[in-house]
Amino acid sequence: MDPILKLQNGSDVRGVAVEGVADEPVTLTPEYANRIVQAFVLWLSKKSGKKASELKIAVGHDSRISAPMLKQQALMAIVAQGATAVDCSMATTPAMFMSLVYEETKYDGSMMITASHLPFNRNGIKFFEPENGGMEKKDLTDMLKIACELTEQIADISSVEKFDLVSLYAENLCTKIREGINSKDNYDKPLTGNHIVVDAGNGAGGFFAQKVLAQLGADTTGSLYLDPDGHFPNHIPNPENKEAMDAIRGAVLNNKADLGLIFDTDVDRMSAVFSDGQEVNRDALIAMMAAILVKDYPNSTIVTDSVTSDKLTAFLEGELHLKHHRFQRGYKNVINECKRLNEEGVVSPLAIETSGHGALKENYYLDDGAYMAVKLLIAAAKTKAEGKILNSLIEKLEPQFETAEYRLKLKGEDFKAYGAKVLEAFTARAKEKGYHIVTPNYEGVRISFKGEANGWALLRQSLHDPNMPLNVEGNGEGDCAKITAMMKELLSGFDQLDISVFDK
């Protein structure tokens, strides 16, 4: 296989961009980046029906140390193919998508140089085009095949236009907050009197404190890691990471803040912390966004990934009277399912993963952490005006008691096929034991337990890697361990499945 094709990771390009980690040679070289972006220009020209010379394509990046090098290659590739390049410098993934939408820009295509929360030596590219937004997996495969046939091209980029996209993006977020709160006392600075801290994890999200919250009157004293630093010296910029959540929780409590917001590196994900230190991530974040949307979309369908809790379903369906459509892992999967439902006449305002990727129909189905933060801030102001606190929106969501996740390694070349055999045998064994297999189910095998142990387990194949994730949730003392033991029994005896993780 051509090494360029190996850089595909779902609908993104991902690879090792700089040396610095043992046994991880550079795979996303400057030359490969150049050829891949050239291929994007050619692919976009064909798709849009425009000549390359008629295309205007924007490039943005996060704080990674390899970003300047990759940006230079991207700009040269665009110019070499005859298109007009725009340098947006430090930006966010959602902002790069919105550059196709804003009247001030309306570019023909854009790209974000990022590898989300991965280590400092990694990088990648996300591509956007106006018709479908983010590129689909098949389209990226086709584009990379074009790149395999190209050679590196050098071009003069000294006169490339520079545009401060993040400032335009921030202005639009400020407008949405002002309109959403519609304060009669202080329309321009509706967050006056609120203390809100941000943890940007040294990624690209620091602008939210400076260009959004502060502009709207909020006190952001105590915010963390707003300065971009591609070495990520403080913690992994990932709202799923315990150390990261501990940091923003500490910032909220130590500064007696009203709310804490935390973003990943490229700001397409977020989580939050209430004033009392309660974390609003995973199931709680999904519940919160659904509770915010329910007034405008009663009886609608919320699409989530597959690893959500039964307790979330009980809250969405029992308390909010919504429908919970538990689908698959992968933010593109949940977004595309949400689109499909709406196209078929099923009202679905939200597609969201436990990872913090959340996309709203009202916002172009764009997974945008900053936009979710905007919705949260508006909701906080409205609940405050009603004499309530933000926590009250999800106070009836039962907290998870105990959870565990295991990644069982698959050996051999054709790990996908072997994983499918494991799932088939696992299902048969579960039925023989009389376990309750949940249906409908759209990914892997989900088993619900009531009686000797209470909770659930989900075994599935990883989207890209040679392993099988197993998620377990127990509802009471000892339930998680009991369910895990039952899973271990069902998964014993497969010669290419490593279950030693259970013994660690």
Q: What are the residue ranges of the model-derived segments?
A:
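An N-terminal, well-structured beta->alpha segment
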Residues: 1-74, 81, 158-193
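Conserved phosphate/anionic-ligand binding catalytic regions in large, soluble enzymes, centered on
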Residues: 5-22, 200, 204, 350-354, ...
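N-terminal small/polar loop signature for handling phosphorylated ligands or for N-terminal nucleophile
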Residues: 42, 46, 50, 56-122, ...
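Short glycine-rich phosphate-binding loop at a beta-alpha junction
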Residues: 49-62, 86, 195-197, 300-306, ...
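Proline/glycine-rich low-complexity loops and linkers
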Residues: 88-89, 93, 144-175, 274-354, ...
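Gly/Ser/Thr-enriched, mixed-charge loops and adjacent short helices
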Residues: 104, 121-252
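Phosphate-binding and adjacent anionic-ligand microenvironments
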Residues: 297-471, 476-504
